[in-house]
Amino acid sequence: MKIAILSRNPSLYSTSRLKEAGEKRGHEVHVIDTLRCYMNMATHKPTIHYQGQVLEGFDAIIPRIGASITFYGTAVLRQFEMMGVFPLNESVAISRARDKLRSLQLLSRKGVGMPVTGFAHSPDDIRDLISMVGGAPLVIKLLEGTQGIGVVLAETRKAAESVIEAFMGLKANILVQEFIKEAGGADIRCFVVGDKVVAAMKRQAQPGEFRSNLHRGGQASVIKITPEERSTAVRAARVMGLNVAGVDLLRSNHGPLVMEVNSSPGLEGIETATGKDIAGLIYSFIEKKSQEKKPSTRTKGQG
């Protein structure tokens, strides 16, 4: 198969592993810089140009689209979809997952467990907002934050009021979320491929820190998950419409709670922690889909 990887940096671990794993399985794999693509919206014959050439003949595309280029990245991916190329994750699903508020609303509507969460911009009653999610301690997040940036734990009601007022001064949209103390500063990253959890790792925050992101010094280790955690992760990915996803869960006293569904999960942490060939499992999924008469691209670039 001829496969494209949309990535701005071919030397990143995830990108290089996906290229290596694909070539090892006999595929022709091209890494394409997302922002350097330019598109022709010609009637009935959409095309993509790259380095002066028309990109054609691709069977599948693996999007590795960074959060900062979501708009342009999903536009390029949508163009590939319109050309009949099978996407590992569809553009509409990536856009859905990148919108934190929309993600939470969809998960809520489908009854997927998650922390009690409030959303606000300029609340006229901050005390009521805090009470609405169960009071302090609570977590306050900037809606646009990634990798633990713009996330604050307010231990007291007074601290929560101060943080919310500060964020209001930035004219920012904020999420106010119950703090799951029993999680002990740890979360679980479930790696979902094609309706199956193929690997899971525990991410433990450093002492004195509550954010467990590996980018913030969190430590990863292999973990055995429960059947309920497994089904919750699969359901969350399905709600987003993602074939491949990193679903972050917290263990609470009332079952697994979804924190986030990542449409472009990194491979380094999970492969290192579990020793599993996740890149190879992704290609197994693509190969299986390619043998279907009509690969399940639900939106055909219409999203």
Swiss-Prot record:
Recorded hits in InterPro entries, A to Z, give:
ATP-grasp (IPR011761), ATP-grasp_RimK-type (IPR013651), ATP_grasp_subdomain_1 (IPR013815), RimK (IPR023533), Rimk_N (IPR041107), Rp_bS6_RimK/Lys_biosynth_LsyX (IPR004666)
**Any idea which positions bind Mg(2+) 1?**
D248, E260
Which is one Gene Ontology cellular component term of this protein? cytoplasm
Give residue ranges for domain ATP-grasp.
104-287
Binding site residues for Mg(2+) 2: E260, N262
GO terms under biological process? protein modification process; SOS response; translation
- Cite a single GO MF annotation: ribosomal S6-glutamic acid ligase activity
EC numbers, comma separated: 6.3.2.-
**What are the UniProt keywords, alphabetically?**
ATP-binding, Ligase, Magnesium, Manganese, Metal-binding, Nucleotide-binding, Protein biosynthesis
- Presence of keyword rRNA processing: no
Q: What Pfam families does the annotation carry? A: RimK, Rimk_N
The main enzyme category here is ligase
Entries under SUPFAM superfamilies matching the protein: Glutathione synthetase ATP-binding domain-like (SSF56059)
The similarity comment for this entry is: Belongs to the RimK family.
**Which HAMAP family is this protein grouped with?**
RimK (MF_01552)
Protein name, UniProt field: Probable alpha-L-glutamate ligase 1
From the broadest rank down, the organism's phylogenetic lineage runs:
Bacteria, Pseudomonadati, Pseudomonadota, Gammaproteobacteria, Oceanospirillales
